[in-house]
Structure formats: structure tokens, C-alpha cells
């Protein structure tokens, strides 16, 4: 089953969670986004990276929720590290209540090597992000300008975020899960 929604100038076919025909299964996403020996920790880290990217681009305020035009890959890397470390500092019972095991995701992130040469191997931090960004680009959600290490969102993602995901209830929920203070 799925929903048909119209946002802005586009029509979206949105699969429900138990849909087996549209979208991606957890295993398909794990295979596309993570290294071949990936565990659930790696998969959840990939989802955390995507959520972090969305929160950095969209703030849920005003007529358009978009807060910025572009982001550098290095800045995204720093945001991921900061958010994971902040999440680990919070109480364990808070982690369990929110359903995010920050320590497990931080462990998976720290297990990835750093490579200043721009390795695209999924076993490096840079390669891990590279594969996630390429996946999002193939889905038409971002433009990834590799030469400049720049990430830009597409009109498709902007419309979807404005009309569906970033109503205030959803936005506050995402911020709470990520541990972001917002007024």
C-alpha cells in the first residue's frame, strides 16, 4: 500500500512501511549505503547521517523550511561527529527511551578510517558519506558537486520537506531524537 500526495508542483507516491513493492527494504538500503560486512549499527548510522543532513538544511520555520543553500562535506562530517558525541553524553536511559543507541552509532562511525586522499571505500568516513550522498543524488534528492565537495538540495526534496515532513510536530520530533535544542 502507498499514499498519493501532491506537494507544490509534484505528485508523490509514498509507500507505507510494510510495502514490499515500492521503496527500499532495510537490507537493500544496508547493501547500498554500507560496507559489505555491515551490521545494524552501520545501517542506523547511515540513517542518522541522512537525518543530520536534513536537519542541517531545513529548520521548519517560515514559509519555506529551507535554512541554507549548500553545505560542504567536511562540515557535514563535523556535524555528525558532534551530534554522536553529544548523544553519547546524555543518560543511557534517555537513549533507550528515544530508541537511538548513540554509543553504538559512534562506535560504528569511529571504526571507519579517515582518509585525506578522498578514498571512496565504504570503510572510510569519507567513502561512507560519499556512498550515502551518491545514493541521495540518484534518488533526485540532492545535487552532490564532488569536485567542490558541496551538497545542495533539489526542488524535489525542498517541496517534500516543506509540505510533508516538516510540519511542526514532525520537525520537533526529529530534533528531539537528534538531541538538538531549538526555539
Predicted regions and their residues:
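Eukaryotic partner-binding/assembly regions in large regulatory complexes
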Residues: 1-53, 57
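A short, conserved structural fragment
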Residues: 1-7, 133-148
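Short, amphipathic alpha-helical interaction segments positioned at domain boundaries
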Residues: 28, 113-117, 138, 157-183
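Positively charged, polyanion-binding regions of nucleic-acid-associated proteins
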Residues: 44-79
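Short acidic, hydrophobic short linear motifs in intrinsically disordered regions
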Residues: 66-80, 89-93, 98-120
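A contiguous, surface-oriented mixed alpha/beta subdomain in the mid-to-C-terminal portion of proteins
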Residues: 90-94, 142-144, 172-177
Amino acid at each position: 500500500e502507498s499514499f498519493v500526495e501532491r506537494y507544490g508542483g509534484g505528485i508523490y507516491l509514498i509507500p507505507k512501511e510494510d510495502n514490499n513493492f515500492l521503496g527500499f527494504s532495510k537490507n537493500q538500503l544496508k547493501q547500498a549505503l554500507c560496507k559489505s560486512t555491515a551490521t545494524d549499527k552501520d545501517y542506523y548510522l547511515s540513517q542518522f547521517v541522512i537525518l543530520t543532513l536534513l536537519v542541517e538544511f531545513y529548520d521548519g520555520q517560515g514559509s519555506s523550511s529551507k535554512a541554507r543553500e549548500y553545505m560542504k562535506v567536511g562540515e557535514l562530517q563535523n556535524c555528525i561527529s558532534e551530534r554522536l558525541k553529544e548523544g553519547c553524553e546524555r543518560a543511557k536511559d534517555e537513549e533507550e527511551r528515544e530508541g537511538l543507541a548513540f554509543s553504538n552509532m559512534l562506535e560504528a562511525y569511529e571504526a571507519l578510517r579517515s582518509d585525506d586522499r578522498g578514498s571512496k571505500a565504504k570503510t572510510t568516513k569519507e567513502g561512507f558519506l560519499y556512498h550515502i550522498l551518491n545514493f541521495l543524488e540518484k534518488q533526485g534528492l540532492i545535487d552532490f558537486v564532488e569536485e567542490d565537495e558541496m551538497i545542495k538540495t533539489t526542488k524535489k526534496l525542498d517541496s517534500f520537506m516543506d509540505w510533508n515532513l516538516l510540519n511542526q510536530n514532525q520537525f520537533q520530533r526529529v530534533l528531539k531524537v537528534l538531541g538538538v535544542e531549538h526555539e
